[in-house]
Amino acid sequence: MMDISPTCYGYIDDEQDLALVFQGVFNGNLRCIERRPYDAEKVELVNPGNIFVFNEEKSGIKRWTDGFSWSPSRISGKFLVYREYNRLGSTHDLPLHNVPEYNIFERAHRKYFYTGLLKKTFSLKFNMDPTDSTKLETFHLIAYYTEKDIHQGSLRRPSENPFFHKFRPSQKLLDALQKVAVGNGRSNPSKNNERGRTKAHNYKTRRSLSSSPSYCDLLSNYNNHPGNIPVRTAVQLPLTTFNNAPREMHQQQHRQQQQYLLPIDEQNKLPLPYMQHQPQPIGVYNPNYQPGLRRTVSQPMIFCNTYNTLPQQPTAAPYERRGVSPSVIYSSNTLSPIPYQNIDPYSSRSGPECNHSKAPIAPTMMPPVHHILVHDYRQPKPVTDSINPPNVNITTSTTNKNLDGIYILPAPRMNPPAQTQYQMIHAPDSMQHPPTFSKNNTSSNPKSHQYSK
């Protein structure tokens, strides 16, 4: 048999019901809960109509736990109301699930079933010691009920129960119930007054903002001209309301902003990207051409001090047909040497698969006056005997002409000398089989240790 039981049975609706129940507890006619119920007792104790009252200091219960799943609290007057939600739906038939039970994601997203059970709580701090008025004790009330019981009237309130008619709540208890804040059991009237003063201050602030001159002017303009829609941006306010800086500073900022609106001069225009310009010949300076990229120190530029006005087309030197780049280019008037850099990777290649790019010559430049002697490797090589190569000192005096009429002297070829054949000398048999030494063969003559011939 359980030694724990509900304090009373019924339904708590308002403060009058609270006063009757607490007065019965203070008089000793109703019994408080002295300990926390066990897990086996919770199922039988949590039933609609049961009302529990316990003293926090004497029972040691800081928080009431009954093992049920409840929703977040809702404020109802001075009470906190909770709804029971059963995750597995014990009051309904469970549907079949193909998902295993260990699937946490599926279990976390299951629907909660409202069972209809409600829990209403209330807390009160009351002085039970007449000798010490500062000593307060905390009393908690827990009541269970269902909506069906309320609509059907199966649960009676303490004010409707004849058993509670003999209890007369004291004025001290009624004052303590009046001081309880809404939604909790903490009585702090000073904080409530402070909250009220804060609300009044905020209301006065909003009233003062609405009565500002700019807002009143806007409303008066709207009343005089009903067709216009009141817009706050149309109000003209002095410049000092936005910024306290002097007027000269604003004028200077205005002038700086106007400079960005001026048209750009032709000489101050920035160059366009490089891909928007047509490519120019490499190594030739054109004064009318404006490249998209700026020339740096590492990028050489070929130019002449004087220019020839004759409309002369560029001509290619004879060596250009063979893909040989000139080493020096001379100007037409000053004959000053200008270094030439050929960047074309295919200029030194030959063959039908390579498109020859001729060395660019400016129209103001003359062809080179000096030809470069280049060995023509297209001439047939002299046939030599691989077994007996010719001597190195022998030089051929034959000269050949290339297609341009230039005499070409073949370069001397370094031929390796003939290998010298050496005769193999075999060692005598005595070297192959050295004599053996023994103890009897020892002597002081050093010649005796020599090999026998």
UniProtKB/Swiss-Prot annotation:
GO MF entry, a single one: DNA binding
Pfam families on file: Gti1_Pac2
Comp. bias intervals (Polar residues): 433-453
Bias type Basic residues, positions: 198-207
One GO CC term on file: nucleus
GO BP of this protein: positive regulation of transcription by RNA polymerase II
InterPro entries with a match to the protein in the record: Gti1/Pac2
Source domain of life: Eukaryota
Region ranges (Disordered): 183-210, 428-453
Protein name as catalogued: Uncharacterized protein YHR177W
Species, as recorded: Saccharomyces cerevisiae (strain ATCC 204508 / S288c)
Organism classification: Eukaryota, Fungi, Dikarya, Ascomycota, Saccharomycotina
